[in-house]
Amino acid sequence: MTGKAGEALSKPKSETVAKSTSGGAPARCTGFGIQEILGLNKEPPSSHPRAALDGLAPGHLLAARSVLSPAGVGSMGLLGPGGLPGFYTQPTFLEVLSDPQSVHLQPLGRASGPLDTSQTASSDSEDVSSSDRKMSKSALNQTKKRKKRRHRTIFTSYQLEELEKAFNEAHYPDVYAREMLAMKTELPEDRIQVWFQNRRAKWRKREKCWGRSSVMAEYGLYGAMVRHSIPLPESILKSAKDGIMDSCAPWLLGMHKKSLEAAAESGRKPEVERQALPKLDKMEQEERAPEAQAAISQEELRENSIAALRAKAQEHSTKVLGTVSGPDSLARNAEKPEEEDATEEDRPAEKLSPPQLEDMA
C-alpha cells in the first residue's frame, strides 16, 4: 500500500462524514411533476441546512423510506414517532422524513411531531361533531317533511260525478256552491277547492291544444264571442255534432248553447206578447161591455134629467113672463082656481051603495 491509501484507510469514518458534509451539496434535478408545479417540494425557511442531510448514511435513508412507504411492514399509525429506533429521532432524520418523496408521504411528514398529531386529532373530532350535527339537522328536516306530507284523497265514483257536473256548470264555484257540494259528497270544502284547482289546471293543459291553435277558449276571443252572442266558427260548431262532451271545447259549447237558448227565449217573448195582445183586447172589451152599458144608461139618465130641468125652467120662465106681461094674466090665473072650485062643488054627488053607507056610518 502507498502512504496515501493507508492514511485514507486509517482515518475514521466521522472525519469522512464531516468532509462530505462540509462540501457543497450536489444539485438535484427537478422534474415537471405535480409536487414541483404546486410548490410542495419547497423547503421552509426555518429548516436546517441540507448539507447535514446529504451526509446521512444511505442505509438509514432506505430504512426510513421502507418503513414509511405503503408497501412496508409498518407505518406511522402503527409504530408512531416513539416506535422507531433511537437514531431515527435525530433532527437530521426528522428533516429527511419531512422531505416529500411522493404525494402520499406529504401528510405523514406534516404529522411527525406530537403537536401536529394533537391538532389533527382535534380537527378530526371537530369534523366528526360537524358531520353529526349535519346528520341530525337532515334527520329533523326529513321528519318535518314527513309530517307536512298529506295523504291523497280517494274519491268515489259518485263524488267524481257530482264534482264533474259542478265543474261543467262553473269553473269557479262560489261559497254557496261549494257548501252544497260538501253536503252532497260529504267532503270538506278545502278538499273541494283543491280538486277544482287541479281540475282547472288539467283543463287548461288540455285546452292549450284546443283547435290545434293558440288561445284558451274560456279566457280568449271565443269566450267574448259567446258572451256577446256572436256566432262561433264552423270548425267549433262541427265538433259539437258528436256531442258537446266529446267536442274540443265542451264548456265553451255548453255556454254557447245557453246563450242561444236565452236569445231564442228573448225573441219569443215579443211574439207571444203580440199574439196575446188581441186576446187581451177581446177579453177587455167583453169585460168592459157591461161597464159601458152602465155608463150609457147613466148618461141617458143624466140627459133626461137635464132635459126635464130645462123643461121645468122653460115652464117657470113662461109663468114668470106671463105674470110680468100684465095684471090681466094675474086675474086670469086667480079666476082659474075659483072656477075649478066651483066645478068641484057643482058636480052631482054620486049615489052610494048600502054597504058603503054602512061603512060610513
Curated annotation (Swiss-Prot):
<dbReference type="GO" id="GO:0000977">
    <property type="term" value="F:RNA polymerase II transcription regulatory region sequence-specific DNA binding"/>
</dbReference>
<feature type="region of interest" description="Disordered">
    <location>
        <begin position="1"/>
        <end position="28"/>
    </location>
</feature>
<feature type="region of interest" description="Disordered">
    <location>
        <begin position="262"/>
        <end position="361"/>
    </location>
</feature>
<dbReference type="Pfam" id="PF03826">
    <property type="entry name" value="OAR"/>
</dbReference>
<feature type="short sequence motif" description="OAR">
    <location>
        <begin position="304"/>
        <end position="317"/>
    </location>
</feature>
<dbReference type="GO" id="GO:0045944">
    <property type="term" value="P:positive regulation of transcription by RNA polymerase II"/>
</dbReference>
<dbReference type="GO" id="GO:0005737">
    <property type="term" value="C:cytoplasm"/>
</dbReference>
<keyword id="KW-0804">Transcription</keyword>
<dbReference type="GO" id="GO:0001227">
    <property type="term" value="F:DNA-binding transcription repressor activity, RNA polymerase II-specific"/>
</dbReference>
<keyword id="KW-0716">Sensory transduction</keyword>
<keyword id="KW-0844">Vision</keyword>
<dbReference type="GO" id="GO:0060040">
    <property type="term" value="P:retinal bipolar neuron differentiation"/>
</dbReference>
<dbReference type="InterPro" id="IPR001356">
    <property type="entry name" value="HD"/>
</dbReference>
<comment type="subunit">
    <text>Interacts with MITF.</text>
</comment>
<protein>
    <recommendedName>
        <fullName>Visual system homeobox 2</fullName>
    </recommendedName>
</protein>
<comment type="similarity">
    <text>Belongs to the paired homeobox family.</text>
</comment>
<dbReference type="GO" id="GO:0043010">
    <property type="term" value="P:camera-type eye development"/>
</dbReference>
<feature type="region of interest" description="Disordered">
    <location>
        <begin position="104"/>
        <end position="151"/>
    </location>
</feature>
<feature type="DNA-binding region" description="Homeobox">
    <location>
        <begin position="148"/>
        <end position="207"/>
    </location>
</feature>
<keyword id="KW-0678">Repressor</keyword>
<dbReference type="GO" id="GO:0060042">
    <property type="term" value="P:retina morphogenesis in camera-type eye"/>
</dbReference>
<keyword id="KW-0238">DNA-binding</keyword>
<dbReference type="InterPro" id="IPR023339">
    <property type="entry name" value="CVC"/>
</dbReference>
<keyword id="KW-0805">Transcription regulation</keyword>
<dbReference type="GO" id="GO:0007601">
    <property type="term" value="P:visual perception"/>
</dbReference>
<keyword id="KW-0217">Developmental protein</keyword>
<dbReference type="InterPro" id="IPR017970">
    <property type="entry name" value="Homeobox_CS"/>
</dbReference>
<keyword id="KW-0371">Homeobox</keyword>
<feature type="domain" description="CVC">
    <location>
        <begin position="208"/>
        <end position="261"/>
    </location>
</feature>
<dbReference type="GO" id="GO:0008284">
    <property type="term" value="P:positive regulation of cell population proliferation"/>
</dbReference>
<dbReference type="InterPro" id="IPR003654">
    <property type="entry name" value="OAR_dom"/>
</dbReference>
<dbReference type="InterPro" id="IPR009057">
    <property type="entry name" value="Homeodomain-like_sf"/>
</dbReference>
<keyword id="KW-0539">Nucleus</keyword>
<comment type="function">
    <text>Acts as a transcriptional regulator through binding to DNA at the consensus sequence 5'-[TC]TAATT[AG][AG]-3' upstream of gene promoters. Plays a significant role in the specification and morphogenesis of the sensory retina. May play a role in specification of V2a interneurons during spinal cord development. Mediates differentiation of V2a interneurons by repression of motor neuron gene transcription, via competitively binding to response elements that are activated by the ISL1-LHX3 complex, such as VSX1 and MNX1.</text>
</comment>
<dbReference type="GO" id="GO:0005634">
    <property type="term" value="C:nucleus"/>
</dbReference>
<dbReference type="InterPro" id="IPR052294">
    <property type="entry name" value="VSX_homeobox_regulators"/>
</dbReference>
<dbReference type="Pfam" id="PF00046">
    <property type="entry name" value="Homeodomain"/>
</dbReference>
<dbReference type="GO" id="GO:0021953">
    <property type="term" value="P:central nervous system neuron differentiation"/>
</dbReference>
<dbReference type="GO" id="GO:0045165">
    <property type="term" value="P:cell fate commitment"/>
</dbReference>
<feature type="compositionally biased region" description="Basic and acidic residues">
    <location>
        <begin position="266"/>
        <end position="290"/>
    </location>
</feature>
<dbReference type="GO" id="GO:0008283">
    <property type="term" value="P:cell population proliferation"/>
</dbReference>
<dbReference type="GO" id="GO:0007406">
    <property type="term" value="P:negative regulation of neuroblast proliferation"/>
</dbReference>
